């Protein structure tokens, strides 16, 4: 290595998946978005993001120029390089990792927190989660990017502010910044921590995708589920953690299974295992992933779990809650 060559340090972070233990739509807002109520659970399974931080050269912000005059897209393009085929969309501006960096820089400018010197960062995405599967993969990537760049660029935004920044990128981004199991309301940005028992899940990822906008517009989608109190949800966790008992359910399941046969097949497969697993199979988000909570009596039976994975109608995994 040349004596004066720039070196880089690497930060590697898990960008975890999430599942919804139940998912209700409680109404439609004036802005067209829907209010939701759900319990998010984070998993020890996900993508990995590697942030290579160059010690030099750095991008320099002209302190004589009003921050409001800074071209955010141009600055973000100077500071951030994406690597990994899955990280690159047809337009880099549409990539959620790039959007996260751009939104973070804009917030730094608005709050006069933009440093004069910023290190350049190469972000490498090691993709494991399927896209559009209800696991929050892209949102998790965006949240991980916000958290790590906030650290690298020494912007010193607190968690509450980062959650507000994340909500501008997507409704599922805040839970990954929150970083723990939570009851969510609003569009998913109003979060209350909840302590849940450790669990393992048999997760199936059918090769199916139903357009989210089409689902929200579907005439048979329930949009007026009664909003439950936070205290009720905390006290009734036995009704949705291992098994799923009314009123807890996923409003999208009947619609998605009617439109996507592969999801219906995966869910029926898991339902056939319920009596042994002692759990209720269900779908996460608006699909297409389905999962089955596993009772402790089966989690140590590796031969049985291997058999279930092998016989599944699509790709299957056994994963654990974070």
Curated annotation (Swiss-Prot):
Pfam families: GHMP_kinases_N. One of its GO terms (biological process) is isopentenyl diphosphate biosynthetic process, methylerythritol 4-phosphate pathway. The keyword DNA damage does not apply. The active site is at 18, 172. InterPro entries: GHMP_kinase_C_sf, GHMP_kinase_N_dom, IspE, Ribosomal_Su5_D2-typ_SF, Ribsml_uS5_D2-typ_fold_subgr. ATP binds at residues 130-140. The keyword Kinase applies. Pathway: Isoprenoid biosynthesis; isopentenyl diphosphate biosynthesis via DXP pathway; isopentenyl diphosphate from 1-deoxy-D-xylulose 5-phosphate: step 3/6. Its EC number is 2.7.1.148. It catalyses: 4-CDP-2-C-methyl-D-erythritol + ATP = 4-CDP-2-C-methyl-D-erythritol 2-phosphate + ADP + H(+). SUPFAM superfamilies: GHMP Kinase, C-terminal domain, Ribosomal protein S5 domain 2-like. Keywords: ATP-binding, Isoprene biosynthesis, Kinase, Nucleotide-binding, Transferase. GO terms for molecular function: 4-(cytidine 5'-diphospho)-2-C-methyl-D-erythritol kinase activity; ATP binding. It comes from the Bacteria. Belongs to the GHMP kinase family. IspE subfamily. HAMAP family: IspE (MF_00061). PANTHER family: 4-DIPHOSPHOCYTIDYL-2-C-METHYL-D-ERYTHRITOL KINASE, CHLOROPLASTIC. Catalyzes the phosphorylation of the position 2 hydroxy group of 4-diphosphocytidyl-2C-methyl-D-erythritol. This is 4-diphosphocytidyl-2-C-methyl-D-erythritol kinase. The lineage of its organism: Bacteria, Pseudomonadati, Pseudomonadota, Gammaproteobacteria, Moraxellales.
């Amino acid at each position: 290595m040349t004596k004066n060559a720039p070196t880089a340090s690497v930060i590697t972070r898990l960008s975890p998946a999430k599942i919804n233990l139940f998912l209700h739509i409680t109404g439609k807002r004036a802005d067209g978005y829907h209010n939701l109520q759900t319990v998010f659970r984070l998993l020890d399974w996900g993508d990995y993001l590697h942030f290579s931080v160059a010690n030099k050269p750095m991008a320099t912000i002209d302190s004589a120029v009003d921050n409001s005059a800074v071209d955010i897209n141009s600055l973000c393009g100077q500071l951030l390089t994406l690597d990994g085929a899955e990280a690159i969309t047809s337009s880099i501006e549409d990539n959620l990792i790039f959007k996260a960096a751009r939104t973070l820089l804009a917030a730094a400018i608005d709050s006069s927190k933009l440093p004069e010197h910023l290190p350049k960062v190469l972000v490498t995405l090691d993709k494991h989660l399927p896209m559009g599967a209800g696991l929050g993969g892209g949102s998790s990537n965006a949240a991980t990017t916000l958290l790590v760049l906030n650290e690298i660029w020494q912007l010193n935004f607190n968690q509450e502010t980062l959650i507000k920044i994340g909500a501008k990128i997507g409704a599922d981004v805040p839970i990954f910044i929150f970083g723990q199991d939570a009851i969510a309301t609003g569009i998913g940005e109003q979060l209350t921590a909840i302590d849940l028992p450790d669990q393992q899940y048999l997760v199936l990822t059918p090769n199916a995708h139903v357009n989210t906008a089409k689902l929200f517009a579907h005439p048979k989608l329930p949009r007026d589920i009664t909003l439950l109190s936070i205290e009720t949800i905390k006290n009734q966790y036995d009704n949705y953690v291992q098994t799923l008992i009314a009123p807890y359910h996923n409003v999208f399941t009947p619609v998605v299974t009617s439109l996507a046969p592969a999801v219906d097949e995966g869910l029926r497969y898991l339902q056939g295992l319920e009596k042994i697993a002692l759990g209720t199979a269900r779908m996460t988000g608006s699909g297409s992933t389905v999962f089955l909570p596993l009772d402790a009596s089966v989690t140590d039976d590796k031969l049985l779990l291997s058999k279930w994975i092998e016989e599944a109608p699509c790709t299957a995994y056994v994963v654990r809650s974070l």
